[in-house]
Structures are given as structure tokens and as C-alpha cells.
Amino acid sequence: MTASIINKTIKSIVAASAALIMAASVAACGPNAATPSEENNASNGGATTSKVTARSLDEIKKSGVLKVAVFSDKAPFGYIDKDGKNAGYDIVFAERLAKDLGVKVKYTSVDPAARVDVLTSNKVDITLANFTVTDERKEKVDFAQPYMKVALGVVSPENTEITDVSQLKGKTLIIAKGTTAESYFEKNEPDVKLQKYDQYADAYNALLDGRGDAFSTDNTEVLAWAKTNKGFKVGITKLGDEDTIAPAVQKGNKELLNWINDEIVKLGKENFFHKDYEQTLKPVYGSDVDPDDIVVEGGQL
């Protein structure tokens, strides 16, 4: 190859490269190009799409529907009754909230671990699923004033009754994922083997089938379950700190949060939650439980 041919080839390559660079520069300046701020947002983990925001009170009223996340397998708090309808302590509360807003209620059934996600993804307006207030959850959602108080309990077969946590060492404890029982035992009782289930129904079936030595969740729940399942007993009725249960909304949704808080105060003046207890919980607990050990009126402990 002669020198003149080589020189022509090099010039052609340089010219082509320059053309490509110029074309890329023009494209970068076009309407689809990311601005420096957008690039910074992306590199810092920020979303370039708009945030999914919660519905305002006006939007809820105009839609005619209040969207509420509830349990469908946790009697007597949230479950499906024999007629296929949502029922329970939380459901009575949800129906009253919707009534006072002048709308109907639309229920979304959730597993314990999904109670935060349905709010952050804006699938519901309120989570009202026996939701215990914790510092970790407060970082992700906003809690209203409480309407119940609760601790953990442990239920087991009465012929092998667990009456002290020390008896669980080396044994299998059934829990539901995403619950305070899960976090409590992982943090405080590492020698207890945890068998986890997504749904309460599956967890209780595991206990009934003998796949674990005991089951732990809210004491209000295990006390109710043991009353309707012969051969089981709540040997530990109060474990860990006494916590509260409250409605939750999407983080930053102050308008709906303030409305719920005002509603809880108003309902307290008519003793609403004690009436709810009489209707939904007393038929299960009977005289074994003092309603004042569970019920919180007006958000005041």
C-alpha cells in the first residue's frame, strides 16, 4: 500500500469519526436528552418519574370510595364471615370512617408483610389491619392515634404447654412474616427456631398440624384463637413491651392523618371502640378479658 493511499484512508477515518461525534452532540442537545439535574438524580437513586402521591380528602370524596387494607384471615379483628363479607373489629371501624366521610369502603386483603407496601404504592388510603406501631414502621408510614393496645402472646398445645420463653430454646416457633413477633424473637431470642408463614391462616394450620411447638403473635389474637380451638392454651399471655395498634397512612399524608385523628377523638366521646368490642370481640373473649386491657378510646392511653 502506497503512502498516498494510507494518508487518504486515515483522513477518511478521521472525517467519519468527527461526523459521528457531531451527530452524538446534536442528539444530546435534543428534547430527549437528560438535563444535568436529572442525571444527578438518577446517579443518586432519585426517580425521574413523579412520586406516587396519596389521594387528598377531596379526591377520596369525589371518588366515592375509601380504600382500606385489612386482614381477611385474622378473626375476630379482620376476616371473611360465612356470608363472604368482611367482618371484625377493624372492619366496624373502617365502615364508620367511610360513613363519616360520606363514601363507601373498598377493602384490599393484605398479608402482614404487605401492610406498608400497599400504602407506599398508593393501592390504599389507609391500612387498618391490626397494625402495631413500631419505630421501624414509623420511618415508612404515618400512624394516627391508637385505638388498641397489645403485647405478644404464645399459644401451644395444652399437653405440651409453653409457659415461659426459656421453654422455647431449641424448639420451633411458628410466626407470621412482617409481624412484631418476628422482630421480637429475632432480636431477643436467637436460640428459638422460627418457622415463618406469609399468612395467618397458614401459620395456624401449621400449629394444628404439629409442624411447630407453638405460635406467637398479638396476645389479643392468640387468646381469641385458643377460645375457639380446643386442645390449645395461651401459656404466655404477655411478652415484651405493651404496644399500640393504630391506623396508618402514606408518609406525609397529613391531611388524611389529621382527619383520622380528629375522628378518633370524636368517636371516643361516644365510647365507639367499647361498643365495637361488645359487638365483635366479647362474643369470643367472654368474661376472660377486661375490655379496658385492649380498648383505647379517643387515642388516649
Q: Where do the protein language model's features map onto the residues?
A:
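Extracytoplasmic small-molecule ligand-binding "clamshell" domains
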Residues: 39, 46-130
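Acidic, polar ligand-binding/catalytic clefts
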Residues: 95, 104-167
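Ligand-binding clefts/hinges and TM-proximal coupling segments of bilobed small-molecule sensing domains
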Residues: 36, 46-51, 183-197, 234-238, ...
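Short helix-initiation/N-cap motifs at beta->coil->alpha
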Residues: 106-117, 160, 177, 195-205, ...
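Bacterial lipoprotein signal-peptidase II cleavage site
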Residues: 26-47
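Extended ligand-binding regions for polar small-molecule ligands
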Residues: 30, 45-47, 91-100, 179, ...
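Periplasmic-binding protein-like
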Residues: 148-156, 223-264, 284-301
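A ligand-binding cleft/hinge motif common to bilobed small-molecule-binding domains
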Residues: 117, 131-139, 208-209, 213-242
